Regions:
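Long, well-ordered core segments of solenoidal/helical folds
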Residues: 105-106, 110, 150-162, 212-222, ...
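Pan-zinc metallopeptidase signature
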Residues: 165-253
């Protein structure tokens, strides 16, 4: 059954429509609307970087690009491959495209065993974490792009309208509510970043979270089953104090916050009050552009939106970046006329950690 879920069929003439570079190959039927040469080159470098970091030898790896008519891109990882869907007429910017491919690559190596709510935070959190920190360390991602991604993730985590959910509750909504869906990703990422800082602090910079992850990859490939308690044991072997309370705080309940030095001493952190993006309609509206579940007297209702009408609004990552006092502009078409409806972000706010490059002062 698992094999069937990982099976993809691509029908058509692929003789000209592929690119091979060492063990890597990229395949497409519809021209994907991106520079496949530079996409594949970046993929190759990132693949080498990751297989080296995770202590896993390189092997044949295939990327399949397919066309879809929607906004943005989505991707799913399978053994030795990933499939990425994108809209050739509205290609993603290079930065977002790279984040997605780096995230999918991590899935080739990093897994835990156990039920979904016990492992998804690690699988998706480590993919979000390493897709940012490894390219940063290798100079493939500059500090500004790294910080932008980390700070958006912090907002998605700590100002999420679903932030009060436990990881088990979030897992139950994983496929039906995109806000709950993001929680295991972002909580897992900030837990790993925080753990890396604790390990470095306690071992005078000798042990990193990479070392633990490499051990997991090695022992799982030798047939060992490693679940959440096995993970905690591995951390405790180095830190000599119970790990479950940290996991509970940062992942299971999400009540904790990562430490200031979670991403290294070159960054400093401050807590910023940011809007909780809750506009008085069902959160699916933000993805589908089709108003659902309008809350009477809620922000959208007060601004004049109607249930079940089609709207045009910024992509969710842009909405998450908005600050208190900003205004969300929504385009509505009614009877051939289009109007702009503005919703001021004056609702609930939450304190969220945001990092910036540390300014070195000389005295
Ligand atoms: Zn993923």
């Amino acid at each position: 059954m698992e094999l069937l879920g990982d099976t993809y069929f691509m029908c058509g003439d692929l003789r000209e429509q592929h690119l091979r570079e060492g063990p890597l190959s990229t395949w497409w039927l519809t021209p994907p609307g991106i520079d496949v040469d530079s996409f594949s080159a970046r993929l190759g470098t990132t693949y080498d970087l990751m297989s080296h970091t995770f202590g896993a030898p390189a092997h044949p790896y295939r990327v399949f690009l397919r066309a879809h008519p929607h906004r943005g891109a989505n991707a799913s990882a399978h053994p030795a491959s990933f499939v990425m869907a994108m809209n050739p007429s509205r290609p993603l910017d290079v930065g977002s495209l790279y984040e997605t491919l780096a995230h999918e690559l991590v899935h080739e190596w990093l897994h835990l065993d156990g039920s979904d709510h016990e492992k998804t935070w690690f699988v998706e959190g480590s993919a979000d974490y390493y897709s940012l920190v490894l390219p940063l360390r290798a100079g493939m991602l500059d500090q500004a792009a790294f910080l932008a991604a980390v700070n958006v993730a912090a907002r998605e985590c700590y100002a999420n309208p679903r932030r009060g959910l436990s990881i088990q509750q979030a897992q139950r909504l994983f496929f039906s509510d995109f806000l709950a869906h993001r929680l295991p990703y972002v909580r897992g990422m900030f837990y790993l970043a925080d753990l890396d800082a604790r390990l470095r602090r306690e071992t005078a910079q000798k042990v990193r979270v990479d070392d633990l992850v490499r051990g997991v990859v090695r022992d799982r490939s030798a047939g060992e089953q490693i679940g959440i308690s096995g993970w905690c044991t591995r951390v405790e072997n180095t830190l000599h104090s119970p790990e479950m309370p940290h996991l509970d705080d940062l992942v299971i309940t999400g009540a904790g916050r990562p430490s200031e030095d979670a991403f290294g001493s070159q960054f400093e952190m401050e807590m910023v009050d940011v809007p909780v993006p809750d506009f008085g309609f069902d959160s699916s509206t933000l993805v589908t552009g089709h108003v659902r579940g309008l809350v009477p007297a809620g922000a959208a209702d007060r601004a004049g939106l109607h249930d079940r009408e089609d709207i045009e609004l910024p992509r969710y990552p842009e909405i998450v970046r908005m600050n208190v006092g900003d205004v969300l502009d929504i385009k509505v078409s009614r009877g051939g006329d289009s109007a702009t409806i503005s919703i001021p972000l004056t609702g609930a706010t939450a304190l969220v950690p945001q990092w910036r490059t540390r300014q070195h002062t000389t005295d």
